[in-house]
Amino acid sequence: MRKPTALIILDGFGLREETYGNAVAQAKKPNFDGYWNKFPHTTLTACGEAVGLPEGQMGNSEVGHLNIGAGRIVYQSLTRVNVAIREGEFDKNETFQSAIKSVKEKGTALHLFGLLSDGGVHSHMNHMFALLRLAAKEGVEKVYIHAFLDGRDVGPKTAQSYIDATNEVMKETGVGQFATISGRYYSMDRDKRWDRVEKCYRAMVNGEGPTYKSAEECVEDSYANGIYDEFVLPSVIVNEDNTPVATINDDDAVIFYNFRPDRAIQIARVFTNEDFREFDRGEKVPHIPEFVCMTHFSETVDGYVAFKPMNLDNTLGEVVAQAGLKQLRIAETEKYPHVTFFFSGGREAEFPGEERILINSPKVATYDLKPEMSIYEVTDALVNEIENDKHDVIILNFANCDMVGHSGMMEPTIKAVEATDECLGKVVEAILAKDGVALITADHGNADEELTSEGEPMTAHTTNPVPFIVTKNDVELREGGILGDIAPTMLTLLGVEQPKEMTGKTIIK
């Protein structure tokens, strides 16, 4: 008889003391409450930096399953760069250092370009400020900024505040000048509208386009003509004698500080592809030996990468497979990619000894119409698998609290919680009957907050903690755990050694 170790993820099941608008608290859930009272339990943080997101940002299913399966904090790009700056690793980055060394040796210029805002979707201006401070520290004299104005991830007329903030940092560091200004409509096209990108390229390389004495003047003039941040024409900042402050020339270096690839690829290709054919770049095609991209943009961009992709080796699924154990991943359609692709660290293929069961989600317009979704079918299939002694490790996702929770409707969400509790009982009893152990948790909150304080539907995820129960009375659990600690805890229970790549810490004392 196999003694299964099962991870039961109650998707969207957060914990909050306040009962108002809280479907989790208002639902009748004798099984969950019984396990909470009977077995060792604690709560885990499932949002913000604990899961690799910016501080205070709610978690989501993709990030949650990625962290749980990886057994470590998987930093998203924005947070990864923020942490590198905070911990002093940013300045030591070899790719940045190589670009700086190149321009110092050749007496050439360093150009910084990217989206100038604090939107945090494609870029963050703090990353550019860190580059200005690094250039100043390393004694780079010629530093030029090619600012892409936002107006989309932030307010439509906010550019001036970001220009002011940049001026402050340039004043503080003694380095940097604005060279070109352009709305993201031109510089960050992703739909192969190359005529837009060409305008931006010609401003940066040839100094072609409307000219202004300052970035402020450019923005003021655009506003006067009814053109706001996103759509500002690629413009050139000029000196008193009307010559461009800077153009991009041979042997200059570029650091493109956008971290999200999709809208960075086209403009990067113009500068890095020797055989670029989308438009005629003209006589002057600067040779840039050091073109640095903040993250990996695309195979089509021939640049250096400052923050290389994180390879998630030795995820829980891989370690379990290497130990020769049989594992099952089971969910209904809505959460199937989460227990497979995301849980395996972005890997589609199954590991040796891995089996997958997909139960179709019901075909309804919205899940509040059928709060139980396909949970009974998922449960029946799983209980059958457990009774047949087929698997050592089980990864199960119950989707209801999240998918129905997104409706912001109390009654259906309470029903979803109650159906989840009923099926949780069936699964846990089947596991205990085999002398197995269940770990009951969630990837983030949702059903725990269905109404705003004004009584409006609250459809988003929450930042509340999630439960963690181990159905085994001879263990003690510590406080302060995170989702990345679950896999190490499972390995402890399985008696399998934790690999060094898994930096999470077991929750068992």
Swiss-Prot record:
User: Which residues catalyse the reaction?
Assistant: 61
Could you say which cofactors this protein requires? Mn(2+)
Q: Which residues cross the membrane?
A: none
- The entry marks the following residues as binding substrate, namely 122, 152-153, 184, 190, 260-263, 335
Using the record's annotations, give every residue carrying the modification Phosphotyrosine.
35
Catalytic reactions on record: (2R)-2-phosphoglycerate = (2R)-3-phosphoglycerate
CDD domains found in the cross-reference section: iPGM
Write down what this protein is called.
2,3-bisphosphoglycerate-independent phosphoglycerate mutase
The species is: Bacillus thuringiensis (strain Al Hakam)
Q: What is the lineage of its organism?
A: Bacteria, Bacillati, Bacillota, Bacilli, Bacillales
